[in-house]
């Protein structure tokens, strides 16, 4: 195969603060509303006006009843309409005329119309703010995730991350779109309603407010319990999503081992656990809201009883009693809304804490404050005393004392038994990991002194399992150079032996490859990956067993393409089939993380040792 061509991150910790309401994440979340401040202010103003109009409704209705039965005079809110449109004094019951009632009814209609207008403004502007904040948060979180190191994703299930991008942010959206404005509007309704109630009858108002302390205590107790259950449910749902993601991404393995029932049982168990938490949350919610409203219904019952006695004594006009009852319902609704807002803040605080855990995660590959610029890259890669181990594997060194130089344009083959450290070694080249000890340099510059994006611009990787994205063939080829012309894309495909099969598709380069490139064969995907690397034009190549899973015909086509790709580039080749590396400039033999042999194919065979053992194992049948 590889014949020489001619001339930031530690994982975030678990959710904390489940025992008390921590508003810090929610306050941080509100910072994302700044770009939409004027829309939020407009929604707040509209909501406040709407709340005042809603308070006006009981007053107008009370005036309507008082005037209809001649039990009282008109208030200032409706008096102007009666003066303007009403009838002559002395007509009707108690001096009230049908025209007076018509005038008050017009005020009632105007209140309804204005309230509808303010509701439209509030709902539309809040929808814009909520969708905008969520879109900004998703974009920021996704960009941040893409900048984290490989180690972060090796310690976090993909499903858990996806859950935080979707369900947690959906919970946040509901809070952003509702909590702040509802807090203001319900405050206006509550304070304004209580003031009007005191104006109507202070003694009756005190009776209504007598039940408030018990309601507030109940809300606090239920809210604390709801927060704990909501946090547990979100964690369990993320775990279920992680299991589903794992099974779906490995569907071929699942089906080949007929493990469908096993995976379904695992997912079902995770869903049952989440479902149990969801039922606990539903049960607490079911107790939460009725308990709060029961207190207010008791207050309304007391108002009816005591207000009826005042009306019988002539101390309270019947219209004022109706106004009082309607305002009591309004105040009760406002306090009930506060309890609902409290539970929503609980859930949003838990969801935002989980999202901000990801946003606060830092890569364990810090970028230099003043990176060294890479000008004309020659491609010399040097490993100096490199030792490396994964954090979750105890004290086992995966690489132990590696000293190796790959000269510009040289093809270096890495061979050895499974677990020898071959793949780990090449992951240090694009700086997916940093060595624990020693250093890796490019043209004499420590990789830790380079901008990672600048470094990776000069490194091309063709893995064994090629990942294509679910776009067109052309989009996948130009993935490393989005601004490449169509002619450059075709030229890269021709050099990669891909142009012929691409043109056989009805849509040519516009053919959609499907998720992960499933519509293409393994050899076709590999050649598209080679075309992608050719178009990127890197100085350094990493070929990680690039043909080990291909049939002979596909391997021959890919081999020719790889030889073109390697021309003039420093290349690291990993291969289990030793026949594919016989023409490499140097073969480096690894065993247990150490270099045990270095040389060309013929030299290593003559020398004996591990290389010849591996060679004889692979070719004993042929030699026989």
Mark where each language-model region is.
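Transmembrane helix-loop-helix hairpins at lipid-water interfaces of multipass membrane proteins
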Residues: 40-117, 198-203, 301, 305, ...
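Helix-loop-helix
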Residues: 196-210, 280, 284-353, 358-359
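Transmembrane helices of ABC transporter permease
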Residues: 39-52, 181-232, 303-316, 333
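ABC-type nucleotide-binding domain
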Residues: 374-624
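A short amphipathic helical element positioned immediately N-terminal to and/or at the very start
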Residues: 22-37, 161
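An intracellular "coupling" helix at the cytosolic face of ABC transporter transmembrane type-1 domains
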Residues: 30, 34, 150-151, 167-176, ...
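Juxtamembrane helix-loop junctions of ABC transporter transmembrane domains
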Residues: 14-22, 45-46, 53-69, 107-158, ...
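Short intracellular "coupling" helices and adjacent cytoplasmic loop segments at the cytosolic face
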Residues: 8-19, 69-73, 131, 139-163, ...
């Amino acid at each position: 195969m590889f014949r020489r061509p001619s001339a930031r991150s530690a994982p975030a910790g678990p959710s904390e603060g489940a025992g008390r309401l921590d508003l810090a994440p929610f306050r941080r979340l509100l910072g994302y509303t700044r770009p939409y401040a004027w829309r939020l202010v407009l929604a707040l103003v509209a909501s406040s006006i709407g709340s005042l109009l809603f308070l006006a409704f009981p007053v107008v209705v009370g005036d309507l009843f008082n005037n209809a039965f001649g039990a009282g005079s008109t208030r200032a809110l409706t008096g102007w309409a009666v003066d303007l449109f009403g009838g002559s004094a002395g007509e009707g019951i108690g001096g009230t005329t049908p025209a007076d009632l018509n005038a008050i009814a017009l005020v009632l209609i105007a209140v309804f119309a204005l309230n509808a207008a303010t509701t439209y403004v509030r709902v539309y502007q809040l929808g814009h703010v909520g969708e905008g904040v969520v879109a900004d948060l998703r974009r920021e979180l996704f960009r941040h995730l893409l900048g984290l190191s490989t180690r972060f994703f090796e310690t976090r299930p993909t499903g858990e991350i996806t859950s935080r991008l979707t369900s947690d942010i959906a919970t946040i959206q509901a809070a952003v779109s509702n909590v702040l404005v509802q807090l203001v509007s319900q405050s206006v309704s509550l304070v304004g309603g209580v003031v009007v109630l005191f104006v109507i009858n202070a003694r009756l108002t005190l009776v209504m407010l007598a039940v408030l302390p018990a309601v507030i205590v109940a809300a606090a107790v239920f809210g604390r319990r709801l927060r704990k259950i909501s946090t547990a449910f979100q964690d369990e749902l993320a775990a279920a999503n992680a299991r589903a993601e794992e099974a779906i991404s490995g569907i071929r393995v699942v089906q080949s081992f007929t493990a469908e029932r096993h995976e379904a049982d695992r997912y079902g168990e995770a869903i049952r656990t989440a479902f149990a938490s969801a039922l606990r949350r539903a049960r607490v919610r079911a107790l939460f809201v009725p308990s709060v409203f029961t207190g207010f219904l008791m207050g309304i019952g007391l108002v009816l009883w005591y207000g009826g006695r005042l009306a019988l004594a002539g101390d309270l006009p019947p219209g004022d009693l109706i106004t009082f009852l309607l305002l009591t319902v309004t105040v009760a609704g406002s306090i009930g809304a506060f309890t609902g807002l409290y539970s929503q803040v609980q859930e949003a605080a838990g969801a935002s804490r989980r999202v901000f855990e990801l946003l606060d995660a830092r890569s364990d590959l810090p970028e230099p404050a003043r990176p060294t610029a890479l000008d004309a890259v020659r491609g010399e890669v040097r490993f100096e005393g490199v030792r490396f181990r994964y954090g979750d594997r105890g004290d086992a060194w995966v690489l132990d004392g590696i000293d190796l130089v790959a000269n510009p344009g040289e093809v270096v083959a890495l061979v050895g038994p499974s677990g020898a450290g071959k793949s780990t070694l090449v992951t240090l080249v694009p700086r997916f990991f940093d060595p624990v000890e020693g250093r890796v340099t490019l043209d004499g510059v420590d990789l830790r002194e380079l901008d990672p994006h600048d470094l990776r611009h000069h490194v091309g990787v063709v893995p064994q399992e090629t990942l294509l994205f679910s776009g067109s063939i052309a989009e996948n080829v130009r993935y490393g150079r989005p601004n490449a012309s169509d002619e450059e894309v075709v030229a890269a495909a021709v050099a990669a032996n891909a142009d012929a099969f691409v043109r056989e598709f009805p849509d040519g380069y516009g053919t959609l490859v499907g998720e992960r490139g499933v519509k293409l064969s393994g050899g076709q995907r590999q050649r598209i990956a080679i075309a992608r690397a050719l178009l990127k034009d890197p100085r350094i190549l990493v070929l990680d067993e690039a043909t080990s899973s291909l049939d002979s015909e596909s391997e021959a086509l890919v081999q020719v393409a790889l030889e073109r790709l390697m021309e003039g580039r420093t290349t690291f080749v990993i291969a289990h089939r030793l026949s594919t590396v016989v023409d490499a400039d140097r073969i480096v033999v690894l065993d247990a993380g150490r270099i045990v042999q270095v040389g060309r194919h013929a030299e290593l065979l003559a020398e004996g040792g591990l290389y010849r053992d591996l060679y004889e194992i692979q070719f004993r049948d042929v030699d026989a």
